[in-house]
Amino acid sequence: LSLTRKLDAANQELIRISSSDSLTGIANRRYFEEALSIEWRRARRHSNPVALLMCDIDFFKLFNDTYGHLAGDDCLRRVAHAISRHSERPSDTVARFGGENFAVILAETSIGGALMVAEKIRHGIGELGIPHVSSPFGQVTLSIGIASAAPGFDNPPDDLILAANKALYRAKQEGRDRICRFDAA
């Protein structure tokens, strides 16, 4: 019986390790993709919208070049924690999408609700006050692209990722430290 408990505990730890980012402690991309797929199917069944925030630390390469990789790692941890803190609902999924990119899945959330969460996150990053002398803003900032969709059988979850990434690209093109929403037109 004791051996069975130890094996169960070890299996649970393996699941936790395989689904979380080792640096930040939040979900990793693999877990994000699985969570989005599950939420997409659930939302389609119940005719609910799903919103996605794609977040990118502005001028992060310059941050690493200026302060070093240890400071960069600390910055990533602090930003991940702040994003998690401002994505408050248990149904929200915060994940490291890659490098300095983070994604937030917001279940049952319209574009308006996603804008409110995104603004809280962006403001929260500003409150961290992490110095960044190589940024025109003087501190670490975040660009956020948002998209929301009502899942159907003809639109896969990858379409939502693509839309949020397009909005993120526009936020960066328009000067960074801002939120842009995806508009299909």
Which ranges hold each PLM region?
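A short pre-motif secondary-structure segment
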Residues: 93-96
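Short regulatory alpha-helical coupling segments
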Residues: 15-16, 29-49, 80-88, 107
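Conserved nucleotide-binding and Mg2+-coordinating catalytic segments in signaling enzymes
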Residues: 15-34, 55-69, 77
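Signal-transmission coiled-coil "S-helix" linker that connects upstream sensory/regulatory modules
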Residues: 1, 8, 12-15, 33
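Catalytic-core segments of nucleotide cyclases and related cyclic-nucleotide turnover enzymes
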Residues: 69, 111-119, 136, 149-185
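Cell-envelope/extracellular polymer assembly enzymes that use nucleotide-activated donors
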Residues: 51, 143
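Alpha-helical scaffold within the catalytic cores of cyclic-nucleotide enzymes
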Residues: 80-84, 113-131, 163-165
